[in-house]
A protein has these predicted regions:
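Single conserved hydrophobic/aromatic residue that forms the stacking wall/gate
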Residues: 219-229
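Conserved catalytic core of sirtuin-type NAD+-dependent deacylases
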Residues: 1-221
Length: 229
């Protein structure tokens, strides 16, 4: 960490971190849009296809249980741990993440300090009644039957607790993230391409409301570069 950034963090009273897939690559989880990203070699399954097609649900669960994203064995890296150390000293700080790997929680950050914009891939839930399911139980049944799981309470469709392409963003989480961005005096982006909307609007919102903006990443989209100038 540079001396300048450390000074900004020390002086900040409303620090917000905004993280994307790039922070987790050193934990063995590939990002999505980088040169070796997931979507270079795999096509995403859209939400409407998932709910309307049994075959697509089977494909989705096969991908999940093949550990495509290496989430099960991943542990927090130095980036996660450093952020956790900073946030432990700053109780008013907040973290907004696009990641679904649960590594920020595993690094020691309190749940109340984290907003997950794209959900969490370490468990599943019913799309109708929201009943939570642990993946280990679903995996055992799926490997035997090859049928996509359905809710034992309401017979609804079960899906990993993530936001898929074409699925509506969680309203409460978006509103809280926008509020935190507006209130921030220092907004630090780590490992995000700033290419996924509406989340990519958050650093712009922070900048427009006079927060100092810091971007720590290997690459951004051209559109993001232009909007943040």
């Amino acid at each position: 960490m540079t001396i300048k950034l450390n000074e900004l963090i020390q002086k900040s009273k409303n620090l917000v971190f905004f993280t994307g897939a790039g922070i987790s690559t050193n934990s063995g989880i590939p990002d999505f849009r980088g040169p070796q990203g997931i979507w270079k070699n795999s096509t995403p399954i859209y939400f409407q296809d998932f709910i309307s097609s049994n075959d697509k649900r089977v494909e989705s669960w096969e991908r999940k249980f093949s550990n495509e994203l290496s989430i099960d064995s991943a542990v927090p890296n130095t980036g996660h741990i450093k952020i956790a150390e900073i946030m432990k000293k700053k109780e008013e700080s907040h973290l907004i993440t696009q990641n679904v790997d649960n590594l920020h929680q595993n690094s020691g950050i309190q749940e109340k300090q984290i907003t997950e914009l794209h959900g969490n891939a370490t468990y599943a839930s019913c799309l109708d009644c929201n009943k939570r399911y642990e993946l280990i139980d679903l995996k055992q049944d799926f490997l035997i039957t090859k049928n996509p799981p359905s809710c034992n309470r309401c017979n609804g469709i079960i899906k990993t607790a993530t936001i898929s392409f074409g699925q509506a963003m969680p309203e409460a989480e978006m509103q809280l993230s926008q509020k935190k961005a507006i209130q921030s005096d220092l907004f630090i982006c780590v490992g995000t391409s700033l290419a996924v909307f509406p989340a990519a609007d958050l650093p712009v919102l922070a900048k427009e409301t006079d927060a100092k903006l810091v971007i720590c990443l290997l690459y951004t989209s051209d559109a993001a570069d232009e909007r943040l100038r």
